[in-house]
Amino acid sequence: ILEARARESLDEVLVIASALSVQDVRDRPMDMQAQADQAHAKFDDDRSEFSGYLTLWKWINDAKGGEGTHKLSNRQYEQLLRQNFVNIRRVREWRDIYSQLHTVVAEHKWRLNAAPASYEQIHLSMLSGLLGNIGWKTEGDEVAQTEYLGARGIKFHRHPGAHLRKKPGRWIVCAELVETTRLFGRGIANIEPQWLEEVGAHLLRKQLLDPHWEKKAAEVVALERATLYGLVVYSGRRVGFDKVDPQAAREMFIRQALVAGDLLPEMHKRLPFLAANEKLIAKVESLEHKSRRQDVLVDEELIYAFYDQQVQPELCNGRSFENWYRAAAQARPELLKLTRDELMRPEAAGIHTSAFQLSPIPIPAPTTTLSHQSA
């Protein structure tokens, strides 16, 4: 009811709450079940038994008639209720509970909503007090078609007497869970899983999986999974990892974007130091190849340390980094450009390109041989 006040659905929720406080007013005698079901069908809703209560309440109040219509006597009215298999005594109980709730609302000076509430407003209000009675339909064999996985691992079935025109949806909420031959859900209504995020945000348990670098977005992204009482509300939702663990996101950003250069071509062009550094690294790698040594170029950890020392601590994605670099490079054009000395190990300092230039090969002068005739 408190939630309904905030969501402007107080009028409807008072009717539903009072209906759930008494025994169902619809009679279903053993010897007249088919006739009762036929009479009750006009109250049924496609998606929600809660909505069915509202239809039934309106019919009960309109059936007697009033201004502008022929008003039935009490006897005629009670006869009409019996013909439609509506229990008179329970209707009175329902009205009594409704009146009591209405009085409490009036004492608090809460106003009933003037405009009819939407399906979402009504069911969000109801859901706030029934989060432990949600269910998710499993898929599989024929039995699973009526079976729902509930909170904390329980399994239940929709009640066979549910007043719905259509089969319940994938996600439902129940007014109550009743165990007879097996566990059944009564008072069923279809809900949307995103409503659970809104109403049950304080109960969601979230887990981040697979933090990874996304080249197109130029940021570190993780996949979020949220559960409510063990039920997976959503999974695989992309979340910016910098909002969760900025330090880890920054490290991954530097390694992937700056050290490895894993950026889209257009962003790569806007960061000229990358091309300059890659060109210089290629030259040092060429020296390694010519010298047949593997200890000329420093390892990636030292290149990472170079960037880590100069990049601001709060920068952990492509957008924020590019904005910072554009401003900082105006004052320091050589910002983030590596030098040859920074890329070569100290023990390889003596190696340079001139050491591998080819020296000219001397050609011996021709010798003259004298013949015997000349002699």
Regions found by a protein language model. Name each.
Residues 1-220, 247, 251, 274-310:
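Second RecA-like catalytic domain
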Residues 94-111, 322-335, 339-341:
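Accessory interdomain/linker segments of ATP-dependent helicases and helicase-like nucleic-acid enzymes
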Residues 132-141, 341-360:
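Long, contiguous regulatory modules within eukaryotic nuclear regulatory proteins
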Residues 161-164, 260-267, 371-373:
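Short amphipathic alpha-helical segments with coiled-coil-like heptad repeat character
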Residues 209, 213-325, 332, 336-341, ...:
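Basic, amphipathic N-terminal segments
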Residues 361-369, 373-374:
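Residue-level detector of conserved catalytic or cofactor/ligand-binding positions
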